[in-house]
């Protein structure tokens, strides 16, 4: 059976900008996109840890090493600069739970990568 599973997660990144006048999307530092395996224009879900808002948009490439996490367009209404967000991308796969290992990118307050690891199922392997 094909299921939709999270394949990539950027965990607790800090929002650095919000631009209402941009045409949409979330701008993400290229280093973070590469580490997570998220492609430019890939659909992502963004969850604001501070206010509980959840939204879907698509990723665009931000300057490498900049730490940029910027919500653009209408989504900018749902976050504040300084909020913590979790960014997730999903894939449709035909895999058993014990075979699936999404990539999780952990960052510090400046959105620099501190750790990249596979998220194991509950109970590990």
From Swiss-Prot:
The modification Pyruvic acid (Ser) is found at residue 25. InterPro entries: Asp_de-COase-like_dom_sf (IPR009010), Asp_decarbox (IPR003190). One of its GO terms (cellular component) is cytosol. Pathway: Cofactor biosynthesis; (R)-pantothenate biosynthesis; beta-alanine from L-aspartate: step 1/1. Keywords: Autocatalytic cleavage, Cytoplasm, Decarboxylase, Lyase, Pantothenate biosynthesis, Pyruvate, Schiff base, Zymogen. Substrate binds at residues 57, 73-75. It is an enzyme of class 4 (lyase). The active site is at residues 25, 58. NCBIfam families: panD. This is Aspartate 1-decarboxylase. It comes from Herpetosiphon aurantiacus (strain ATCC 23779 / DSM 785 / 114-95).
């Amino acid at each position: 059976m094909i299921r939709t599973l999270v394949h990539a997660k950027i965990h607790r990144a800090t929002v650095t900008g919000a631009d209402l006048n941009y045409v949409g999307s979330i701008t993400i530092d290229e280093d973070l996109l590469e580490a997570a395996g998220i492609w430019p224009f890939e659909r992502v879900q963004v969850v604001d840890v501070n206010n509980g808002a959840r939204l879907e948009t698509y990723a665009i490439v931000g300057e490498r090493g900049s730490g940029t996490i910027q919500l653009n367009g209408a989504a900018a209404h749902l976050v504040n600069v300084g909020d913590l967000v979790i960014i997730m991308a999903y894939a449709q796969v035909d895999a058993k739970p014990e075979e699936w290992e999404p990539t999780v990118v952990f960052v510090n307050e400046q959105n620099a990568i501190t750790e990249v690891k596979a998220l194991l199922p509950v109970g590990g392997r």
